[in-house]
């Protein structure tokens, strides 16, 4: 389970050896300043050269080398839109962790409040990380294409959903999907996610039924993680299709394109 926590909550634990601060921003951002004791684990490190998620053993090596042991509690933080932290948190959920925290304010807000930031790399203490795969949070291409009664939530831009984007080989969306643009779920005034009441209003307006299993997707998974974390927070049974539309459009499965003749 992933919980969003305040900057004050993080500040009181930032030097506690039972917690590990994980900067999920891209490496260049990390080098330009980071929280005390933070190690850098951005999403690109979670995939191989073919764009596939690492194996459980590779994840164990990655997170163990970063200092995340089985008895250490992770605290993630991010920049303005929350995609990276949401995706890294989902990965940790998939690996069986249920003690994940994300700082709800963005790094720039932390810095703007006059809190300490640091610039030197943090020495890492390697620890044992044991994956305990939780397959219930992950949806495969086979699952999405063969399971009846799913609610598919497309978190890409409206242009992508409507088949108006040149970024897709086969423009459109997975048949039957509902559009909820991920940016509508991002918070304001230095917060990563929108208020729970606003998130509920957006989800209700999209007519997403809480009694159905929901699968979020985007192009390659990161934007879908924002939708995943939002829906999880609202009590939905939700999975993330990490192959997302990039895998779907290559599969030869049907595509719905409202923009086609």
Specify the residue positions occupied by each region the protein language model found.
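N-terminal intrinsically disordered, low-complexity segments enriched in P/E/S/T
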Residues: 1-58, 150-167, 173-181, 191-198
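Active-site neighborhoods of enzymes that stabilize oxyanions during catalysis
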Residues: 2-6, 108-172, 253-261
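Loop/turn elements at helix/coil->beta-strand transitions in domains of secreted/extracellular proteins
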Residues: 17-19, 71-73, 149-150, 210-212
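Structural recognition of the beta-strand scaffold that forms the well-ordered cores
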Residues: 22, 40, 73-76, 152-154, ...
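Thiolate-centered catalytic microenvironments shared by cysteine-dependent enzyme domains
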Residues: 46, 54-143, 172, 211-212, ...
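A short, acidic, amphipathic alpha-helical segment used as a generic capping/interface helix at domain edges
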Residues: 194-210
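Cysteine-dependent PTP/DSP-like catalytic domain, specifically the C-terminal lobe
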Residues: 237-261
